[in-house]
Amino acid sequence: MTVTDIASRTYNHGWRLDPIVRSLLDTDFYKLLMLQMIREFYPDQKVTFSVINRTKRVRLGDVIDEGELRAQLDHARTIRFSKKELIWLAGNTFYGKTHMFSPDFLAWLANFRLPEYELHKADGQYELHFHGLWTHTTMWEIPALAIVNELRSRQAMKGQGRFALDVLFARAKAKLWAKVERLRKLEGLRLSDFGTRRRHGFLWQRWCVEAVKEGLGSSFTGTSNVLLAMDNDLEAIGTNAHELPMVAAALAKDDDELRFAPYRILDQWRQTYAGNLLIALPDAFGTKAFLRDAPDWVADWTGFRPDSAPPIQAGEEIIAWWKSKGRDPRQKLLVFSDAMDVESIEQIHQRFSDQVRLSFGWGTNLTNDFVGCSPDGSVDLDPISLVCKVTSVDGRPAVKLSDNPEKATGDPAEIARYLRVFGDAGRVRTPVFV
């Protein structure tokens, strides 16, 4: 394995276009899994995705050159799935299952391209939207976020000398390795990379994945990044995301349909994957509401991915719910992935490792932790909270309530309606950093 000298490559960067996204597999695995289901059940649905910068103090419109942003987005639209990539998707085993993707779906992917985008500036921020069929706009989420984040990183490093860059990356590497040394001590740890969307850059994510693979050995279970999984012979990790219940809810004709929407689309997911990949994401409209109204069959699923509630609180609540349904939590799985870092992983592991099966998705704090690493003390490389969410479905506003009101998205009037239907119980406002 050849280790890239990232500092030298950054210093020598001077060509007209250094593509940030070079493959459509440079995305999260669950985007492909969801895409296959979307194409089956919602082939004609029109859905808009929008990039949202929750870190308002960082004025991306002032930091990132619009011409460079357009060039990267335009380049991404030229990429197609390669024959090699499609053969790998067809022949690889995912979660112990062969032929995860149907021949018809893979044939359709062969002609796939990202749709057009809409971009303009307002109040120092970029407004970046993707309109069109859900089968196409969904695939913009990860490359759009990766492009914006890496352009910001490149801008922050412009003008730094060769040795300053060398020190920057040396400190970041040492910082990550110190985390690895702590995580090694956790018996039975299962951890994967979830850091594509808000990474510092592709080369840095690749270095992090290769380092953690060596440092944690069998405790490192894989990566959500499909390209890195293919290139490094790792498991591709992922199930589903908030966009599924958000779209289903936006399509609901009345409040009763709205209340049942999260379960209807999970049932469609179950049909698509024949009982595999049964990890539910409960917090789109509040975890308490999800558990309160869940059909009994949800308790038979493999587990949950608590995403926005305080993790200890969420874990306790879900374990209690399983017990109330007569299920043994020790046979169930909790996947924690919300802003995980070494301290929170240690705390959750200590609290729950003897009560339930645990897995961790390590995201931004794995692939973009340069806090305190800059030789000049700059904070321009500190990570920001950047998301790409469904904002409308067939012209109707989409909503995410979340267990944390700071993460809520949608039209205020629609948010109020959703709160009337789902309630506000269990929602806790906490600061969002990544």
Swiss-Prot record:
Record bears the keyword Hydrolase: no
Catalytic function, reaction form: nicotinate + 5-phospho-alpha-D-ribose 1-diphosphate + ATP + H2O = nicotinate beta-D-ribonucleotide + ADP + phosphate + diphosphate
Classification via SUPFAM superfamilies: Nicotinate/Quinolinate PRTase C-terminal domain-like (SSF51690), Nicotinate/Quinolinate PRTase N-terminal domain-like (SSF54675)
Matches recorded under InterPro entries: N/Namide_PRibTrfase, NAPRTase_N, Nic_PRibTrfase, Nic_PRibTrfase-Fam, Nicotinate_pribotase-like_C
Keywords assigned by UniProt, alphabetized: Ligase, Phosphoprotein, Pyridine nucleotide biosynthesis
A GO biological process held by the record: NAD biosynthetic process via the salvage pathway
Recorded metabolic or biological pathway in which this protein acts: Cofactor biosynthesis; NAD(+) biosynthesis; nicotinate D-ribonucleotide from nicotinate: step 1/1
Residues annotated with Phosphohistidine modification: 242
Top EC category: ligase
A single GO cellular-component term on record: cytosol
Gene3D superfamilies recorded: nicotinate phosphoribosyltransferase (3.20.140.10)
Record keyword Transit peptide present: no
EC number: 6.3.4.21
Posttranslational modification: Transiently phosphorylated on a His residue during the reaction cycle. Phosphorylation strongly increases the affinity for substrates and increases the rate of nicotinate D-ribonucleotide production. Dephosphorylation regenerates the low-affinity form of the enzyme, leading to product release.
A GO MF label: nicotinate phosphoribosyltransferase activity
Family the entry assigns: Belongs to the NAPRTase family.
Function of the molecule: Catalyzes the synthesis of beta-nicotinate D-ribonucleotide from nicotinate and 5-phospho-D-ribose 1-phosphate at the expense of ATP.
HAMAP family attached to this UniProt entry: NAPRTase (MF_00570)
Name the record gives this protein: Nicotinate phosphoribosyltransferase
Species assigned in the record: Bradyrhizobium sp. (strain ORS 278)
Taxonomic lineage of the native organism: Bacteria, Pseudomonadati, Pseudomonadota, Alphaproteobacteria, Hyphomicrobiales
